[in-house]
């Protein structure tokens, strides 16, 4: 009997959604979305991150203005307890993601 890899992937998705760390991020995200200041900072931050990623993918180096803007965003995030908690919880969840990525890609890396 063969294993259906898609069933396993769907089971993994459900397991991730049931992690306490996932639920913690989900809960604080609701709080962030309910706070107009935190929501605006987060949306602007994500938009800026996308701009920087596009520049890097195009081979461009972030300018001094970009670097200053990043520092300004970091200050705003650190000055907002909701966003500080949000990113802290994201980091905790990210540990699982990194571990899963390592496990999933192990057989593929062996083929290189």
UniProtKB/Swiss-Prot annotation:
InterPro entries linked to this entry: Com_YlbF, YheA/YmcA-like_dom_sf
Superkingdom of the organism of origin: Bacteria
Family that this chain belongs to: Belongs to the UPF0342 family.
HAMAP family per record: UPF0342
Protein's recorded name: UPF0342 protein SSU05_1260
